[in-house]
A protein has these predicted regions:
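Signature of N-terminal electron-transfer/Fe-S-associated modules in redox systems
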Residues: 3-174, 182, 191, 295
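Short coil/turn connectors at secondary-structure junctions
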Residues: 38-41, 54, 89-92, 191-192, ...
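Residue-level recognition of oxygen-bearing side chains
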Residues: 58-59, 203, 267
């Protein structure tokens, strides 16, 4: 099942990017640097409104550049919420991708690779994100404390099944699942290696390089579409050169080693008995229509190196 991959597959490819489209006229928060290719423009929509971003953007970074700060509503009181993180730890910017049978709810905008024609919608609001009628819950906060439904809706008993429970169920949850079967294809497979490296930041890249140079079979898995971890977002210097250059060189060497497989867009979600690990790989945007949209891998590894990094807790929650 394995195939050879080049370093270009882990860098912004501008799949579906419009080279002739004008640059976004008003992106007050657009900053320089990073892996964003500002020479090419991608059109996408959020809640039906058209915006522009660039190859290398995530949905979150493109919305931020376009001065879109409100991305969601809190679960219970429907208070306005924006970004507080940049990766899979983001709790607020949960969106629905696509429409109809192809829609995917509860997707973190910080993990969505921007692609031409991307359609995203906010969740947990009615009738719109900016004017959410259920924000009235915030005014009722004193009587909607934790576990209020176990005390408030006890009488009359006949109302529970017919009235109270349907109302609570409608208010609960965030995104909505598609009600019909999708035409998208999912697949599964098995992989075997000597060393599984989880995370392709600086530590993960070095671990994969060290093991790969030793001649053992290596799988390097990273949840992001651009391996490099924090080096992609910092002005770091390695060996008197920008860290992004070191990442490119490391990926190029790994791609040249036949005993190494680099898997971007792949989340290792569990470690099980006898060296078995579960991983979910997502397809890159713009791939063949008959290709699997996602693949579940069962990985058998003799050893695992966990290089998942760390996430600082925001001071507001310390």
């Amino acid at each position: 099942v394995a195939r050879r991959m080049s370093v270009s597959e882990f860098l912004p490819t501008a799949s579906g990017a419009d080279r002739t489209a004008p640059q976004a006229a008003a992106q007050p928060n657009r900053v320089s640097g990073g892996l964003v290719d500002r020479a090419r423009t991608i059109a996408f929509t959020f809640d039906g409104k058209r915006y522009h971003g660039h190859p290398g953007d995530t949905l979150a970074s493109a919305l931020m550049a376009n001065d879109v700060a409100l991305l969601g509503r809190s679960f219970k009181y429907h208070r306005p919420r924006g970004l507080i993180a940049a990766g899979s730890e983001e709790p607020n910017a949960l969106v629905t991708l696509g429409q109809g049978v192809d829609q995917t709810p509860n997707t973190r905008a910080t993990m969505v690779e921007l692609a031409a024609g991307l359609s995203a919608h906010s969740q947990n609001r009615w009738p719109s994100l900016r004017f959410d009628a259920l924000a009235v819950n915030d005014l009722l906060a004193p009587v909607l404390s934790a576990g209020f439904y176990y005390k408030t809706f006890m009488w009359p008993a006949a109302f529970w099944e017919k009235l109270y429970e349907p109302l609570i169920r409608r208010a609960a949850g965030l995104g909505r699942l598609a009600t019909s079967a999708t035409a998208d294809i999912s697949d599964r497979g098995d992989l075997h290696c000597d060393v599984l490296v989880v995370g392709a930041g600086p530590a993960g890249l070095m671990a994969a390089l060290t093991a790969g140079r030793a001649g053992v079979r290596v799988i390097l898995a990273d949840e992001d579409f651009a391996p490099g971890g924090r080096l992609n977002a910092e002005w770091a210097v390695i060996d008197d050169a920008p860290a992004t250059g070191w990442v490119r060189a490391a990926l190029a060497e790994l791609a040249s080693l036949r005993n190494v497989r680099v898997m971007a867009r792949t989340t290792v979600f569990g470690a099980f008995d006898h060296g078995t690990y579960g991983a979910l790989e997502l397809a890159a945007p713009g791939g063949p229509p008959d290709a699997p949209r996602q693949t579940f891998w069962r990985v058998q590894a003799r050893a695992c190196v966990l290089c998942a990094g760390a996430t600082e807790r925001p001071i507001a929650f310390s």
